[in-house]
């Protein structure tokens, strides 16, 4: 009988940035909450010298080895060394590539340029994050037309965390507060090729969040946390979204991930021309 390990080392080797590998490794490791994992990440492993350095570290802290490496020679060397160390060594892309090849009836094209595609994706996400931070909470309205998605809504409807989540997926996201009596920047209506989505939540949830966070936007304490006042803010926001034909998502019982998934679906429809923007 195998004795349960309370902690383990997870080594992740990639010939690119390792983002895909890290996501998979963490997703699987999270299923073993009773075991503490120590991550070791080795990106840009593209020659034998780099691999040997990584293997020397693995030798010091034996554990599970996951990898995404295209070069056959480097892969073979990695597997042989792991066999000698008697540690699991798993190519996480191999079964997926095999399934594609079998279904499509086409040999896998293992191209070095794919590494550059991954790197380009990484820098695209960095660019999206920079954009999103610059355009948080109504800042820099002149750049709204450059956004892929603009989130609108009253205070504390998860606009900022959802924006950051989308940016981490390479989506340039801005967010603009809808405040009764103040309005919104004209640039919002000039973003003709951008998906604009309204976020709402129950007055109870918003009141609870506001009571536990900094007060702002110039509201008096009472009106900022009062449920009746919040309900009026929500009515205002819903009317604005209805007026301009912007889809609305209720985030009351949604996680950030679930909200983002709904936005991804809307964005797909929008880009395919299935969502008619500003029907009025």
Curated annotation (Swiss-Prot):
Belongs to the pyruvate, phosphate/water dikinase regulatory protein family. PDRP subfamily. InterPro entries: Kinase-pyrophosphorylase (IPR005177), PPDK_reg (IPR026565). Bifunctional serine/threonine kinase and phosphorylase involved in the regulation of the pyruvate, phosphate dikinase (PPDK) by catalyzing its phosphorylation/dephosphorylation. It catalyses: N(tele)-phospho-L-histidyl/L-threonyl-[pyruvate, phosphate dikinase] + ADP = N(tele)-phospho-L-histidyl/O-phospho-L-threonyl-[pyruvate, phosphate dikinase] + AMP + H(+); N(tele)-phospho-L-histidyl/O-phospho-L-threonyl-[pyruvate, phosphate dikinase] + phosphate + H(+) = N(tele)-phospho-L-histidyl/L-threonyl-[pyruvate, phosphate dikinase] + diphosphate. This is Putative pyruvate, phosphate dikinase regulatory protein. Keywords: Kinase, Nucleotide-binding, Serine/threonine-protein kinase, Transferase. Its EC number is 2.7.11.32, 2.7.4.27. It comes from the Bacteria. It holds the Pfam family Kinase-PPPase. GO terms for molecular function: ADP binding; ATP binding; phosphotransferase activity, phosphate group as acceptor; protein serine/threonine kinase activity. The keyword tRNA processing does not apply. ADP binds at residues 153-160.
């Amino acid at each position: 009988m195998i004795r349960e390990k309370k902690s383990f080392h997870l080594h992740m080797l990639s010939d690119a940035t390792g983002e895909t590998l890290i996501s998979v490794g963490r997703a699987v490791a999270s299923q073993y909450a009773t075991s503490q994992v120590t991550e070791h990440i080795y990106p840009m492993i593209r020659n034998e010298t780099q691999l040997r350095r990584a293997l020397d570290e693995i030798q010091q802290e034996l554990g599970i080895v996951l990898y995404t490496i295209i070069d056959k020679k480097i892969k073979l060397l990695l597997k042989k060394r792991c066999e000698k160390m008697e540690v699991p060594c798993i190519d996480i892309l191999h079964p997926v590539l095999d399934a594609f090849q079998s279904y499509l009836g086409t040999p896998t094209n293992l191209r070095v340029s794919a590494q550059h595609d991954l790197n380009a994706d990484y820098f695209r996400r960095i660019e999206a994050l920079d954009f999103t931070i610059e355009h948080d909470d109504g800042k820099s309205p002149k750049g709204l037309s450059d956004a892929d998605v603009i989130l609108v809504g009253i205070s504390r409807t998860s606009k900022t965390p959802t924006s950051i989540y989308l940016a981490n997926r390479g989506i340039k996201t801005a967010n603009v507060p809808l405040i009764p009596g103040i309005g919104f920047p004209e640039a919002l209506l000039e973003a003709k090729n951008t998906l604009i989505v309204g976020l709402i939540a129950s007055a109870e949830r918003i009141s609870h969040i506001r009571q536990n966070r900094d007060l702002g936007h110039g509201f008096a304490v009472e009106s900022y946390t009062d449920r009746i006042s919040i309900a009026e803010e929500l009515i205002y926001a819903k009317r604005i979204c209805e007026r301009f034909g912007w889809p609305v998502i209720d985030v009351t019982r949604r996680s950030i991930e679930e909200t983002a998934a709904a936005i991804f679906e809307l964005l797909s429809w929008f880009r395919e021309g299935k969502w008619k923007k500003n029907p009025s």
